[in-house]
Design a protein with these regions (language model features):
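A short, surface-exposed loop/turn module that caps and links secondary-structure elements
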Residues: 38-62
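Enriched for short, Lys/Arg-rich terminal
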Residues: 1-15, 19-22, 27-30, 34, ...
Length: 95
């Protein structure tokens, strides 16, 4: 017998990332949240839309939303994309 259930990805936020999101303008916040809801949470593999990072951020993934970036950790075993950073592309990699 073969069966398949549709598993969706859950997006969770680090407290610092949530604070960074609140500092952004409202239209940018909405665009980021919409991107996460439509592209990431609804996908079979969230890696398709992102790019893996290297160096001191190895193991993390980044997602481009205009001039803004989401830095995330993907937890395959529990189907969670954990947002650890969000900000303008010139600043988000500094921390």
């Amino acid at each position: 017998m073969s069966w398949r259930t549709k598993l969706t990805w859950k997006v969770e936020w680090d407290d610092r990332a949530r604070k960074e999101l609140r500092k952004l303008d409202s239209p940018i916040q909405k665009e980021i949240l919409s991107y996460l809801r439509v592209r990431i949470a609804g996908s079979k593999d969230p890696r398709v839309f992102g790019q893996s990072l290297s160096g001191n951020k190895a193991g993390l993934w980044r997602y481009r939303i205009g001039n803004y970036r989401l830095i995330c950790r993907i937890e395959d075993h529990i189907f969670v994309v954990f947002v650890v950073g969000v900000g303008h592309r010139k600043e988000v990699y500094e921390t």
